[in-house]
Amino acid sequence: IRTAFLLDREGRTPTEAERDILRRYCGFGGLKCILNPAKELTDAVRWAKSDLELFAPTAELHRLIRENSRNEMEYKRYVDSLKGSVLTAFYTPKEITDTLAGVLAGHGIMPVRLLEPSAGMGAFVDSMLRYAPQADVMAFEKDLLTGRMLRHLHPDRKVRVEGFEKIEKPFNGHFDLALSNIPFGDIAVFDAEYE
């Protein structure tokens, strides 16, 4: 997260070492404790005993986001985005995405226009681009922090930091391959197209 904010401030693309750092990000899926108050040391008394070891890193996370937000409203947008992702931000391992991309390529499926509707850190995009490097990619990632990092990893691709439900009608039928491991669960998403 720190690296992504640094790249934004400096207005540049990441070095290979910075790309390696960005790729290690794995989201906050299952870590509800990041939503607990962590501004002051006294906030720790309200934390569950099992989460206390994460108090200091959580305080650092919020400090980092606050320092890199233009204002309190932007900080709140980041926190709200984190709230929206703690139940769904579980990213597919590279071994699985590589295997799926290899099987598709083995069957002659080489996309010209690739859609990733829930990209996370872009594992499916990375795996498929090894077989179809010229593919035109559109990747959606709803979480603001993850989307920021994904944009740095794929500066030459179309990365949209918003929900897939925002895709415009002209893209219906546009893609020849959609590849994803969308979040599963009973969380409803509003989509006016299917109202």
Language model features with spans:
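Class I S-adenosyl-L-methionine-dependent methyltransferase catalytic core
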Residues: 1-195
